[in-house]
């Protein structure tokens, strides 16, 4: 028999949905990262469209109430014609370039830790509000059963969409996790610390005044790079989230010690900027203790954290050496 083409019939089983529902992430706090990065992308787009009259309108609001978590932004919103593609289909994202999110698989991450996900959105210029209900509890039951389903069959079984009138000048996206049973997600202090170390927010005024601004005066190039960073105003239960860096720390002798001046650097290849960053030490060049949440040098892309504080540990000859520094590396090469 000669070579012949045989037709195929590709399908995706139900366990693909399990991956999209956060099964690949061991840390439940990633839920905050996924939704905030989507909000930041939407806010960036809204800003580019001139929808904000004031900078403080570029805001993400996170609220914990009882066992519910809500993440709300005033970004561009999802257009009515794109709701099914963006909020029901899997991995349809068209994001490129300066978008923090990429593949369109993060929106169901919270379904691993709650009984129901609710997405509400309205796009600027459209008189509609769309609401998507995803029954996460039912989805988990189906995935745990021995019944065989294709992924799209399960999505149809657990998802509903409704539409109602909305004012055309409204633009927003809101995701609510109902009946959250993962206690770490409901822990306000843990959530605020995770957000401060992860999402693209600005530094506190005191840290900028005492550590960064004096160094910027001597390094105008890096001040320009800093001003070009993506930042969003993130509020948690009404309180603003800032990066956790401070101008003083408590050392191993339980004494308060000042952080020294910031030093800047950049990485280039054949004249092309790959990354830039800053670092600092204590005035006495002592180690930052484990109680200092911002110790070590961190990696960021589009001002969103990549990995955690241990990312660069293998570059030091001794593990302890990494604790002498604080700082950030901002990758800019795509």
Task: Name each model-derived stretch.
Residues 287-334:
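GHKL/Bergerat-fold ATPase module
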Residues 23-61, 106-112:
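Conserved ATP-binding N-box helix of the HATPase_c
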Residues 1-11, 46-100, 125-295, 304-305:
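Interdomain "switch/hinge" adjacent to the Bergerat
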């Amino acid at each position: 028999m000669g070579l012949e083409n045989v037709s195929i019939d590709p399908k995706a089983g139900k366990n693909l949905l399990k991956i999209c529902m956060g099964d690949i992430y061991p840390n439940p706090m990633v839920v905050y990262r996924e939704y905030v990065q989507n909000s930041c992308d939407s806010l960036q787009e809204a800003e580019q469209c001139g929808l904000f009259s004031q900078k403080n309108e570029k805001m993400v609001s996170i609220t914990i109430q009882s066992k519910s978590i809500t993440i709300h932004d005033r970004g561009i919103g999802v257009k009515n014609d794109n709701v099914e593609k963006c909020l029901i289909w899997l991995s349809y994202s068209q994001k490129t370039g300066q978008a923090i999110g990429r593949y369109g698989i993060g929106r169901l991450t919270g379904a691993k830790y709650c009984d129901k996900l609710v997405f509400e959105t309205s796009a600027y210029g459209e008189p509609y509000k769309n609401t998507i209900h995803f029954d996460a509890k039912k989805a988990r039951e189906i995935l745990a059963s021995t019944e065989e389903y294709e992924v799209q069959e399960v999505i149809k079984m657990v998802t509903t969409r409704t539409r109602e009138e909305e004012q055309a000048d409204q633009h927003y996206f809101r995701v609510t996790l109902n009946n959250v049973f993962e206690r770490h997600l409901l822990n306000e202090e843990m959530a605020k610390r995770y957000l401060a170390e992860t999402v693209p927010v600005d530094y506190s005024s005191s840290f900028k005044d005492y550590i960064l601004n004096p160094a910027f005066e001597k390094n105008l190039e890096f001040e320009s790079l800093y001003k070009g960073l993506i930042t969003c105003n993130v509020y948690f239960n009404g309180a603003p989230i800032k990066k956790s860096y401070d101008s003083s720390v408590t050392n191993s002798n339980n004494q308060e010690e000042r952080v020294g001046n910031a030093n800047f650097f950049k990485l280039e290849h054949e004249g092309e900027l790959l990354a830039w960053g800053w670092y600092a030490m204590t005035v006495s060049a002592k180690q930052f203790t484990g109680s200092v949440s911002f110790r070590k040098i961190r990696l960021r892309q589009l001002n969103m954290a990549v990995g955690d504080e241990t990312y660069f540990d293998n570059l030091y000859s001794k593990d302890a050496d990494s604790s002498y520094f604080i700082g950030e590396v901002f990758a800019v090469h795509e």
